[in-house]
Every structure is written in C-alpha cells, then in structure tokens.
Amino acid sequence: MVTSASVAFAYTQHQSAFYYAERQAIWMAIGFVALFVLSRIDYRRLRPLAPAGAVAAALLMLLVLVPQLGVTVNGARRWFDAGPLGTFQPSELGKLAFAVYIAHWIDKHSSYIGDFQKTFVPFAAMLAGVLALLMLERDLGTSVVMVAIFVSAYWAGGGRVRHMVLLVAALGLGFVALTLLESYRMARLTAFLNPLADPLGTGFQATQSIYGLASGGWFGVGIGHSIEKYGWLPEAHTDFIFAIVGEETGLVGTTLIMLGFLFFTLRGYRASLRAPDRFGVGLAASITTWIAFEALLNMATVTNTLPITGVPLPFFSYGGTALATTLAAVGVLLNIARSGTGSSLGRSDEAFDRWRRNRRTPVPGNRRRPSVSR
C-alpha cells in the first residue's frame, strides 16, 4: 500500500515514483531479519540488556534535539538523517526498549508492586521523564502510545487499579493543558469538532480523509486508482494511509484490516496470559497494547473519531524505523507465545487462573515469587 499511496508524492518530490517504496522495502527486510532472530532467541535473554537499552534510547531521544544532529520536519525535531535509508526516529526504537525495561523493572519490584512510594512513585517518575523527552520533540501521539505501553505492563504485573486511575487522570489533565497552550493542537481540535466549518483550512485533512473513505464504497476504486493521493490528502502515505486503503479497497478492505488487528490483539493477550513468568506477562501485554492501541488511534484519527494525533498505522504507514521496530517487537511476542504454557485452547482457563493469581498484590515483606529465568 505504501507504493500505491506514495507514488504521486514521491514523483513530485524526488522525481522517482518508487522513492518511498524502495526505502520502505529495505526497512522491511531489516525488520523481518530482526523478527526472525528475536523469535528464535529466548526473550528472557533480553533482561540483562534492558537497562542499557532504555538508557541508550533515552540518550538518542535527547541527542535528536541537538540542532546539528536532529532533522526538523514541520516544526518538530524527531529524526536523524539516515542517508539513503531516509530518516531514523529514536522514539520508535524507544517503544520497544522501554517496553522491555518496564516489564523487567516491574518484575524486579513485584514483591511490593502495590506500594505507592516504593513502586508507583518511581514508575510515574520514569514515565514522566520519557514523556518530557517526547514533549520536547513535540510528539504527542507517541506520548499517548508510550503511556499505554507503561500502564499495560504495570497493570499486567499486578499494579493497583486506583494508582493507574490516578496516573491516567493526571496525564489527561496535562494533555489538555498542552492542547490549550499550543495553537496548532487547538487548530486540530477545532477541525476535529467540525471539519466542514473550514474545509479548505484547518479541516482540510480531515475532510479529504472522510471523502477518501466514502468514495471507496463497498469494494473500492481499485488498487492504484486513488484520487486523494494526488495532492488532495496530506500525509497520504504515512499517517493517513488508512484513508487510501479505504478508497482503493472499500469497506471490505478496511474491515479485513480491522479484523486482522483484532486477531493480532487477541493472540497477543493470549500469549501474555500463557507466559511462563511475570516478565513475559508484562512484556507481551505491553507489546500487544502498543501495536493495537496505535492502530486504534490511527483509524480513529482517519475516520475523524479522534483529533489528529500523528500516529502511524502499524505495518502499513510509511516509516522505516516504525516498521522495523514493530516487526522486531512481533518477533519478541512470538517467542513469548512459543515459550508459553499449554498448546491447546483447553489450557486457557488454567492460564487465566495463573495470571489472575500473579496480579494479586503481594503483601509487603513477603518473598517475591521467582521468575523462571533471570
């Protein structure tokens, strides 16, 4: 779909119709290699690398803010120049690095996971630090996804619900404040509430996205025959590729994609339920939530159910770092699923009972249940 959605923009910008498709293919190859390798390596071997990986990701997210190093696009500095591969976005790599680290950290502190001061406060502080870096990059969409990654791992690891409610409420107020303070975010909110009020201005992207989806009908106009991609819909090959999918393949195509993500989500959480240790439970939950939530946000944005967030559609949108990192995360998830207990649906109740017991908040001072492997 990247080839079809980007061909017009690629030719006008780079005089090559396959400029973006070629780079996406290279990143896809890198991603599939990472998927294969990580699906074969025991996921528990990632634990010793978790702290170093998180620190490296944070440093890269900090370095990208340096004017001489980072690349600025549309007023946001989030990328490094990757030469013939296009650009490299550290925050995408950070999703996987922080997912591994937070699952490791929660398992390490599982003996007092319900303690507000010993666990929740440090957890919230780590999340706040990551969000601060993302806000400096002006990346609200990735910030929302990062919250989902952290919170899902915390909940799967046995965190208290009231702590998560408090955290989400505080972050919600923070995001509202940021929206009110930034004029371009207010413009997005206004366009979301009534895109037809200014269809040639702030509501242009949302309006064209809806037109694209509507013109697809049941079966679409055919692959490669989209009209919106010819300069009408901005970011047609990136954040709004779902609208091009809807235009070219119709309701049938978009429904199949949604069902595909639903299937992935169910299988991912099933892998989390059957993971042999708390680290695997948290890691599988965070990876599944990351990809599923990102897809949900993107589709909601394209259909104007939510304001524009700038979140890509996993596996479909153009973006080499995002694609390679997501495929690598799928490799980790496959390894967790392969390591899980039970090989038939009949074991699902047993797996759920074990997961439910693991989520019970340990009494402070009790000895932590050991993981299968360190």
Residue ranges and their predicted role:
Residues 26-34, 248-265:
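Hydrophobic alpha-helical transmembrane segments
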